[in-house]
Amino acid sequence: MVRVRLAPSPTGTLHIGTARTAVFNWLFARNQNGSFLLRIEDTDKERSKPEFTQNILEGLQWLGLDWDGDPVIQSEQTERHRSAIQTLLEKGLAYRCYASEEELDAMRTQQKAANQAPRYDNRHRDLTPEQEAAFQAEGRDAVIRFRIDEHREIRWNDLVRGPMLWRGADLGGDMVVARRAPADQIGDPLYNLVVVIDDAAMAISHVIRGEDHIANTAKQLLLYEALSLPVPTFAHAPLILNPEGRKLSKRDGVTSINDFRAMGYTPEALANYMTLLGWSVPEGMNEIFTLEAAAKVFDFDRVNKAGAKFDWDKLNWLNAQVLHSWEPANLLNALAPLWADQGWTLPDTTGWSLSLVELLGPSLTLLNDGVDQAKPFFMEPALEDDALKQLDQEGAKACLQALLSTLEEAPWSGESIDQAQEMLKSAAATAGVKKGILMKSLRAALLGRLQGPDLLTTWSLLAQIGQDLPRLRRCL
């Protein structure tokens, strides 16, 4: 049975790279009728925070990525990790290294001066008992290192990249599997070791993660072998790149799912877009889809090896398509809390509110656009420069005065658009101006600007809440 996992570290909010990895894991698990599991890798005691764990869980739920079972907490598995390290020590596959940080820094400085890649030189790999005793007598603490055969070839078949080959000589020397601690203790177990132990304990069948973990995979395969554990299948997805082709990072600005959510992106559009970051839709499939639809056809044959450049225009287009597909009631449910945050109160009639979202919906790209565009319907807007220039045009105020006089004699409820058309025609004729001048001037008076949604519907909505006449009067 397919069992995959997402293993985020709660040292920050949910990052889009982690979220895209979650999407690929979820899609594969659902495609294979398997399980999508969560493991919280909280072994970084200083940086891991419960609020980040909560943020990650809430972000996954918001995106529609449900998981199976309860999340595994890595820090609760520490004794299992230490037991594995003890096994490696007893087999002679790991050893204590007493080299101080100062000695290691000096080693790296010498390597840099000689234009050599930084690596541990395995200096304490074969200490005699007397040498170990001498270091312990000095009071030195020790890390625990796993022996890496530099002549070893490490091979695996990657579901994305095909046959892979790494050499032991390229892994930087014997790797540290436990932090520095007194010689009679095992320090805190480190990433490559704990991941192997936890994946085996969770019976993970496939490890799906970013290509920046490829070197870790080579190291972890050696640990699987040393501990006689079943080896999962690996798939390394392409990295998400910024528009310049570099790995997307916090320096690029928006990278947290929190940020995308706050900007007004929908979970449907964001999940859709993240799926397209490195995966190609099958021929004949629309690139606007639900996660459930993608899961039916997802496989690694269509996952690209090359990095996926983040395209804001594409994401914005997808988000607009999602918003435009929503029923007015659903859009109102999404916009009403944003309007409430502004202190705006909706009229008692649901019909007016639905008419407003029907008017604004086709022009929305982000949900937050619905705040800016709705503002003139809740607050009297300031007159922008282009609106002031329009109102200074010859005949503009005369036609508005004619329209105001008509409305004061026979108030319009905002219900009959045909009646509004007749009033506009009459006012333009009375003022002796073209209807187009009146239309532009009316928009300037009602909205404070010359761009906006359908004018007659706008006027109708403002008339229904008694806001059309005050706005005409202030311009005269």
Swiss-Prot record:
Main location: cytoplasm
Gene name of the encoded protein: gltX
UniProt key word Acyltransferase: no
Xref: HAMAP family: Glu_tRNA_synth_type1
Chain location of the short sequence motif 'KMSKS' region per the record: 247-251
EC numbers, comma separated: 6.1.1.17
Source species, domain of life: Bacteria
PROSITE patterns, sorted: AA_TRNA_LIGASE_I (PS00178)
CDD domains for this protein: GluRS_core
Entry function: Catalyzes the attachment of glutamate to tRNA(Glu) in a two-step reaction: glutamate is first activated by ATP to form Glu-AMP and then transferred to the acceptor end of tRNA(Glu).
Family listed: Belongs to the class-I aminoacyl-tRNA synthetase family. Glutamate--tRNA ligase type 1 subfamily.
Record-level Gene Ontology MF annotations: ATP binding; glutamate-tRNA ligase activity; tRNA binding; zinc ion binding
Full protein name: Glutamate--tRNA ligase
Oxidoreductase keyword on record: no
GO CC entries: cytosol
Record keywords: Aminoacyl-tRNA synthetase, ATP-binding, Cytoplasm, Ligase, Nucleotide-binding, Protein biosynthesis
One Pfam family cited in the UniProt record for this chain: tRNA-synt_1c
Motif 'HIGH' region, chain ranges: 8-18
Subunit and interaction comment: Monomer.
InterPro entries: aa-tRNA-synth_I_cd-bd, aa-tRNA-synth_I_codon-bd_sub2, aa-tRNA-synth_I_CS, aa_tRNA-synth_I_cd-bd_sf, Glu-tRNA-ligase_bac/mito, Glu-tRNA-synth_I_codon-bd_sub1, Glu/Gln-tRNA-synth, Glu/Gln-tRNA-synth_Ib_cat-dom
Positions annotated to bind ATP: 250
Gene Ontology BP term (one): glutamyl-tRNA aminoacylation
Catalytic activity: tRNA(Glu) + L-glutamate + ATP = L-glutamyl-tRNA(Glu) + AMP + diphosphate
